[in-house]
Amino acid sequence: MQFHVQETMSKGIKAKIDENLDVSALFKDRSDVISHGPLHVSLQVTGNEGSITVEGELTIDWELACSRCLDPVKLHTVIPVSDQFKPASEKDGEETEEDEDDDVIAVTGDRLDLKPYVEEVLQLFMPFAPLCSKDCKGLCQNCGQNLNEQKCGCSTERIDPRMAVLKDLFKDEQ
């Protein structure tokens, strides 16, 4: 997934990337990712005059822990990709207004490696708080019972900790 920047732009090269990428290293220290398949990369790379356009999609099947009850959640995620890459200007190492364009990714050097870019896009689109269902009740804060399976016998009365002293005061008067 590497391209020569100048050659791709000057010759107007069009290339199709259709491969599976092993992303195990990205998730090895993450306890919320139970399992995952390979990342399927399907991209069209087009060299234009002065830029390289990358369009397509990333697809992954993974199993994540529900953020409320910790049950496994199987997800099929399709991530649309559409970005433009341009060579960075080399004027004393300072960025010009042209380089500060938010829609363009600056490339330093003559090689464009799309693997780090694809991995970053995957991490940015990873679900922040996956849920097994919209109405997931989560775990009991006192005993840890999964409230989706059954109710626990814990008290649901909540007392503001700042007022707990007053509660004890009224008990003594009775």
Please place each PLM-identified region on the residue numbering.
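Structured interface patches
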Residues: 1-174
